Amino acid sequence: MNQVDATRKRPPGIVKRWGWRILAILQAALLILVGLAAVAVASRYGGRWLPFLLAGAAGWVLAQVLKAGLSLPLAANPATAAAMVSSVWFPVFAAVLPALAEELGKYVPLRWMRVQAREQALALGLGAGAIEAVFLALPLLLNPVAGTTTLVGMLISVWERSWAVTLHAGMATLDGFAACARRGRWLLAAMAAHFLADLPAGQYQRLVALRAPGVVTWLVIAEILVPLLALAALALGRGLWRKAGAAPGPAQ
């Protein structure tokens, strides 16, 4: 998922001196919570979760490779990059590419591994969300200057990552149901949820690059919409799996 960057300005005081450390600690705490959630799944459902957790992380990495292969040739050309950002269609492009690549990055391993339970899909989603959080937090650990931020920016970052992991888990339950029941419309539903989650972030990034008004409005929309989509995806996925049983068969 796209990251909304609310960490632009370095203020004086304790946040100036310790901001990157605090944010790194909060990011680490978030990863610990994800790990505890995985342990909770493991304690209830045995070792069946671990391959899916690892597959989720691997699928996310492969999705980033695919995204880079498609977008870097355009971004590497300054003229093309400037034209893309200035276009009103930039948010759509910035949302469509992650939605397609990352949801296929969940669906393909779920289909290949023959997912049979919602908890397996949840584990895969947690793996994808956790590795994404690691990649976004890594620059803070390697380059403290890159992590300087305001206290509000730190809280927004942790809020966003928490709900992004939750959304990954929710979308994975839809992908898993689509893979298990051979009902592709739920894969499309997961892609649609991912697209809607990234669309405001793309518009936010565009307005920041253009120094145009409306930045705060789109930031607020992004931070509200992601939790709503995460809760909706989790509820829908749970309902689908519960209605069909633990291992729904292919549609006739």
Regions found by a protein language model. Name each.
Residues N2-Q252:
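Hydrophobic alpha-helical segments at protein termini of multi-pass membrane proteins
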